[in-house]
Amino acid sequence: MKRRVFLKSAGLAAAGAALVGCAPVRETSAPAKIHKGDGRLHLRFFPYELQLRHTFTVASYSRKTTPDVQVELTWEGVTGYGEASMPPYLGQSVESVCAFLQKADLSQFTDPFLMDDILDYLDSLSPGDSAAKAAVDIALHDLVGKLLGAPWYKIWGLNPAKAPSTTFTIGIDTPEVVREKTLEAAGKFNILKVKVGLDSDEAMIKAIRSVTSVPLAVDANQGWKDRSKALDEIFWLKEQGVVLVEQPLPIDRLDDTAWLTERSPLPIIADESIQRLSDISRIAGAFHGINIKLMKCTGMREARAMVSTARALGMKVMLGCMTETSCAVSAAAQLSPAVDFADLDGNLLIANDRFRGVTVSEGRLSLPSTPGIGILKIANNY
């Protein structure tokens, strides 16, 4: 379908699916104070730097750590957990997240089940700060799920047996390191995700293909600049067993992306071009599908609305993540039975996870029956 037709229907579908400088708080190993009996919501948060198992390289940068803020939301002695993870491209920081959370007065709320009221208030505090908002959204969902005694996939009526396989990400590296990482992952995952976008793309794909024939997804992270060359590359990638391509061109090249999508033999999925629900109508027709990430869209509530809107437009849906603990990854996984693709491996890339949650069994996501977002805090870890 031509993009102009998509744009017209997108506006209707989006409207119909709309659902539902401050110093950060210091880290502490002391348990969170229990406010049982006062009937109010209480928010605690602290910085927590994520240590990556390997240097992570994409088209625009490399890093060994990811800044993160952990959040705890307590009501009547029950605590829900959330987090804000902030890779460089998100444009947010520990300082900005802590400043936002510092001004969020959640103690005014006495009923955590009024989730829309709470999250609407939070969203009204600023036009941005998506990761900070997601942290509270996740913690609130965890809290309410615990109070209800059920995981959110069950509350939403989703079948956990329909959770898809998740990709495992291979960052940009030398052919030798790529082969080593691929051998580590190929026996555990049914599909691998490869970061591309540099002149070394074909060498990386050939290195992977020298050790495994497992299907691949590729993510250019806006790294390709010429649409004709990108199309040639996509035809070559299809011959190598690639099944989808994420964000091939820069976000300001929407018309070129629409041209590419119309001609591509593989699904083209928006990543950096999509953040919130309101973005779907803007990019509809320029991509075959969208990659929803909680840190971009402000959390689980909006992610669910985005799934509904994309489905109404006939678009493919992927659930993605940043490098995160099992807290945010397990929160996103609650929606996984409703999507086509999952890229929920962020917790597997870090060495200092604070939680146990969703696992991978024979390459597929395995959702625990633990109430809330499906996590258990690891003892003696903050």
Annotate the PLM regions.
Residues 1-2:
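N-terminal secretory signal peptides
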Residues 5-24:
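N-terminal export signals
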Residues 11, 34-50, 68, 76, ...:
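Flexible C-terminal active-site loop/helix
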Residues 23-33:
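Bacterial Sec signal peptide processing site at the extreme N-terminus
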Residues 34-45, 61, 73-75, 79-148:
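Metal- or metallocofactor-binding catalytic centers and their adjacent structured scaffolds
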Residues 71, 77, 136, 149, ...:
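Conserved, mostly hydrophobic/aromatic
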Residues 152-264:
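Metal-dependent enolase-superfamily TIM-barrel catalytic cores that perform enediolate-based chemistry
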Residues 256, 263, 274-344:
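Catalytic alpha/beta core domains of metabolic enzymes, predominantly
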